[in-house]
Regions:
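Catalytic PLP-binding core of fold-type I/II PLP enzymes
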Residues: 49-70
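A C-terminal functional module that forms or caps the active site or interfaces directly
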Residues: 180-188
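N-terminal glycine-rich anion-binding loop in soluble enzyme alpha/beta folds
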Residues: 1-22
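Glycine-rich, proline-tolerant flexible connector loops at the mouths of alpha/beta enzymes
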Residues: 4-8, 31-45
Length: 188
């Protein structure tokens, strides 16, 4: 392949395959970060899809770290593309076919409901960003609104969205709470 996008993507795929082969019997899940693949364009996305499919073939749960969130129609397309099935003529196909995806709640219910709907239909799940572990997360997530940090309010919305789609005693909707903030995690 040489020094090409295809070459980089193939190297990533082979690396991932090696890691999965060495660990699949020791771990329950993987969480590939799609941006690391997207930077290599279409070849990178092909490597992402191959990685997802290979992990699923090894019975691993795949959490697509995609952090999507947009207006309703765009979120619906993201939800179908990552967790659902897209209609092509008379047939339906799974796009990336992850088991779970990470979602950004910043656009509100418009951006979350399409994911919740697909989760209910496909019996898959989402993890919504509530209190993340990145160093600058507090710039917005810790802002007080009526004396309460924003992350608490987001956590309440996650619980509300999650109560609408229960499956097998668990909700299809979960929260991302960074382990670097144990005090906030305990509150949530």
């Amino acid at each position: 392949f040489g020094e090409t996008l295809e070459g980089a993507a193939e190297a990533i795929w082979q690396y991932n395959k090696g890691i999965v082969d060495a660990t699949y019997d020791l771990i329950p899940a993987v969480k590939p970060q799609i941006a690391m693949y997207e930077q290599f364009g279409i070849p990178g996305l092909i490597a992402y899809k191959k990685t997802v499919d290979y992990c699923k073939s090894k019975d691993l749960v795949v959490i697509g770290d995609i952090k999507r969130g947009d207006i309703g129609s765009t979120s619906a397309a993201y939800a179908v593309g990552h967790l659902g099935q897209v209609q092509v003529g008379s047939r339906k196909y799974a796009g990336f076919d992850e088991d779970f995806a990470t979602v950004n709640p910043y656009l509100g219910t418009d951006g979350i409901k399409p994911f919740v709907d697909v989760c209910k239909e496909e019996k898959k799940g989402i993890f919504i960003l509530v209190k993340t572990s990145n160093p600058s997360s507090g710039e917005f997530q810790d802002r007080l609104i009526d004396g309460r940090p924003l992350y608490e309010l987001v956590g309440e919305k996650v619980a509300e969205w999650g109560s609408e789609c229960m499956g097998d005693s668990y909700s299809y909707v979960g929260a991302v709470v960074g382990a670097t903030y144990p005090e906030q995690g305990e509150i949530l």
